[in-house]
């Protein structure tokens, strides 16, 4: 069975514009073969609102001059910007024995584990994917699977401007509040949290893969 820490190549990409990154993810997924190494991209985006395939325009209240991009991920509307960590796992799910739901849970678990390491309890919600602390959303998810391979992923609010979330119904839920890692008393620098998130995500993929294979044995 492959080990995620050894077989998934992690790339730290800094701040990258959203649309070229989206194009690069699609191209990587379309052109990959059964031999292509999986990758994990960790980065930030300049300010942008993205609307998923299930997105409804009424959940966008007033985006001002911030661009809105209609994308092919699952989910509704969210915001990306500086101070928010984004993780895009580009995986051949068959290689890891994962389904879409299992991948979503692994992404959520990576954030739950990260926050738990700092003594902050968090939880997922079956009716609204993501990670929550005392009812406030700290991490959002949206993925796409093509030919058994995933792209898009997870965003974690760390020290970003919270105001842009007031201009939308985050993830399609009116009145949903958001929070940030730094609001939770965690002052670890962003670049260190990025590394830690990547490690916890790879560990969560490993754990989900082992559980999936055990269930089928």
UniProtKB/Swiss-Prot annotation:
Spell out the catalytic residues: 171 (acyl-thioester intermediate)
* Taxonomy, superkingdom: Bacteria
Is the keyword Protease in the record? no
What is an annotated GO biological process for this record, any one?
Answer: protein modification process
Principal EC category: transferase
Q: Give the positions of the site Lowers pKa of active site Cys.
A: 137
Q: Where does substrate bind?
A: 73-80, 140-142, 153-155
* This protein's pathway: Protein modification; protein lipoylation via endogenous pathway; protein N(6)-(lipoyl)lysine from octanoyl-[acyl-carrier-protein]: step 1/2
Role played: Catalyzes the transfer of endogenously produced octanoic acid from octanoyl-acyl-carrier-protein onto the lipoyl domains of lipoate-dependent enzymes. Lipoyl-ACP can also act as a substrate although octanoyl-ACP is likely to be the physiological substrate.
Q: What else is known?
A: In the reaction, the free carboxyl group of octanoic acid is attached via an amide linkage to the epsilon-amino group of a specific lysine residue of lipoyl domains of lipoate-dependent enzymes.
Q: What is this protein called?
A: Octanoyltransferase
